[in-house]
């Protein structure tokens, strides 16, 4: 298999060779855009109201039925997934795993916002789609949950312009060491939550048996550190390479 750096260079070449390719994107009228935004705002508000007291209703039969209906409607409306083309049995598995992920997320952190859950859930869906493409049975375990949940915790912290660079640097240094297997307790909720998620991955994929899993996670972290530097001082070539590096490492981890 090609090295990761070779794959990054190959993707860069492919991107440059596609510059003259015309995308067949249908224009969306302003009125339709406005209507779509309105629907998105209403959908988000509706879900937030529904999830507000979710922790107290997870075992309630009526709540579970309503959750089934909502998740199924969400899957069917998601244009990227193209859910309707999946076989009925696969649709059922998709639905079951999505519901379980939402329950797990709410149990893990009752303070999670809907945006955070959706951000992590998209990664779960990507993993499930990869399994479909590889014609494998869909599976869900705590490492998939934990890896997906790392995104809202780490990305949102590092992308927050209100947090100074020094705090981000300290966190990145700690996370890099944690992904290498170092245990250095920190007295802050963010660190404890991320540490718990990494521990879940370690429980499912022991380091000695699955070194490639942690190599991929470290690649993502390296890309994240580089992306913090992604500002006006970087040229287009550097920005493109960082984007390919980070995105490629994420898909590689999904595959593992």
PLM regions: where:
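All-alpha helical catalytic cores of prenyl diphosphate-utilizing isoprenoid enzymes
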Residues: 85-150, 156-172, 178-256
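Acidic, metal/ion-handling microdomains and their immediate structural contexts
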Residues: 1-96, 129-180, 256
